[in-house]
């Protein structure tokens, strides 16, 4: 995609540069901005999935594209990370009012990013680009949330409700296997059957000693 920097007036470029620099140094909570040094009109962004939503624990990559008419016209927003959301189309396009009819030249990039993050908390089924997600949100929220969580786990880097960390008190399959396979682990087979194992070891040593004694007697008889 061609850069729009050359199409923007110098004073707009300075304003964009100033805001992007501020956003990079002091981003909104849960949002990080990665400016494109070669193209200031192509902003790469990551947004953390808000807690209490099906997107919690996920990290979503997106981009904002500033057109040649910016700020008279709103930027275009796209999710680069696949997400199940009513207001995100199959190509990642984001449908939110602030990027359309509610846009004014006074609104800045920070406002856009905060609005998109809020969209993860409060989806709007009335302006759905993903009709299935919009329908489920209205008719069967549990199914909608399950689908959203699944895609978040697959594509957003989430491993569960705590973002990939096992929940307290819940053993993982690998942890259980490790405990079973390690006979020296506390509470494992060796720990639970220590006295019995020692008893068997003692009996085995006695049998070996008796066998050696018998073999020695047989050897003496041959002499």
Curated annotation (Swiss-Prot):
Show the ranges annotated as biased composition (Basic residues): 209-223
Q: Which InterPro entries match?
A: Ub_conjugating_enzyme, UBQ-conjugat_E2_core, UBQ-conjugating_AS, UBQ-conjugating_enzyme/RWD
What Gene Ontology terms for biological process does this UniProt record contain? anaphase-promoting complex-dependent catabolic process; cell division; exit from mitosis; free ubiquitin chain polymerization; positive regulation of ubiquitin protein ligase activity; protein K11-linked ubiquitination; protein K27-linked ubiquitination; protein K29-linked ubiquitination
Q: What is its EC number?
A: 2.3.2.23
Organism equals: Bos taurus
Residues bearing N-acetylmethionine are 1
- Could you tell me what this protein does? Accepts ubiquitin from the E1 complex and catalyzes its covalent attachment to other proteins. Catalyzes 'Lys-11'-linked polyubiquitination. Acts as an essential factor of the anaphase promoting complex/cyclosome (APC/C), a cell cycle-regulated ubiquitin ligase that controls progression through mitosis. Acts by specifically elongating 'Lys-11'-linked polyubiquitin chains initiated by the E2 enzyme UBE2C/UBCH10 on APC/C substrates, enhancing the degradation of APC/C substrates by the proteasome and promoting mitotic exit.
Report residue spans for region: Disordered.
155-223
Cellular component GO terms, alphabetically? anaphase-promoting complex; nucleus
GO molecular function annotations of the record? ATP binding; ubiquitin conjugating enzyme activity
Query: What is its quaternary makeup?
Result: Component of the APC/C complex, composed of at least 14 distinct subunits that assemble into a complex of at least 19 chains with a combined molecular mass of around 1.2 MDa. Within this complex, directly interacts with ANAPC2 and ANAPC4. Interacts with CDC20, FZR1/CDH1 and VHL.
Pfam families, per database record: UQ_con
Q: Report the top EC class in one word.
A: transferase
- Name the encoding gene, please: UBE2S
Pathways involved: Protein modification; protein ubiquitination
Supply the alphabetized keyword list.
Acetylation, ATP-binding, Cell cycle, Cell division, Nucleotide-binding, Phosphoprotein, Transferase, Ubl conjugation, Ubl conjugation pathway
In the record, the note on similarity to other proteins reads: Belongs to the ubiquitin-conjugating enzyme family.
Q: How is it modified after translation?
A: Autoubiquitinated by the APC/C complex during G1, leading to its degradation by the proteasome.
Name this polypeptide is given:
Ubiquitin-conjugating enzyme E2 S
């Amino acid at each position: 995609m061609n850069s729009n920097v050359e199409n923007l007036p110098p004073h707009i470029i300075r304003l964009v540069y100033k805001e992007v620099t501020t956003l990079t140094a002091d981003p909104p909570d849960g949002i990080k901005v990665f400016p494109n040094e070669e193209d200031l009109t192509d902003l790469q962004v990551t947004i953390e999935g808000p807690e209490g939503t099906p997107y919690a624990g996920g990290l979503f990559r997106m981009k904002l594209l500033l057109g040649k008419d910016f700020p008279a016209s709103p930027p275009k927003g796209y999710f680069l990370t696949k997400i199940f959301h009513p207001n995100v189309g199959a190509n990642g396009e984001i449908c939110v009012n602030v990027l359309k009819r509610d846009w004014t030249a006074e609104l800045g990039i920070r406002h856009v990013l905060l609005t998109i993050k809020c969209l993860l908390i409060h989806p709007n089924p009335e302006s759905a680009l993903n009709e299935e997600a919009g329908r489920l949100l209205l008719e069967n929220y549990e199914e909608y949330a399950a689908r959203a969580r699944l895609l978040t786990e697959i594509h957003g880097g989430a491993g569960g409700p705590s973002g990939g960390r096992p929940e307290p008190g819940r053993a993982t399959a690998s942890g259980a296997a490790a405990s079973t396979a390690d006979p020296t682990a506390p509470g494992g087979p060796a720990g639970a059957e220590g006295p019995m194992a020692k008893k068997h070891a003692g009996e085995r040593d006695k049998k070996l000693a008796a066998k050696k004694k018998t073999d020695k007697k047989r050897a003496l008889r041959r002499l």
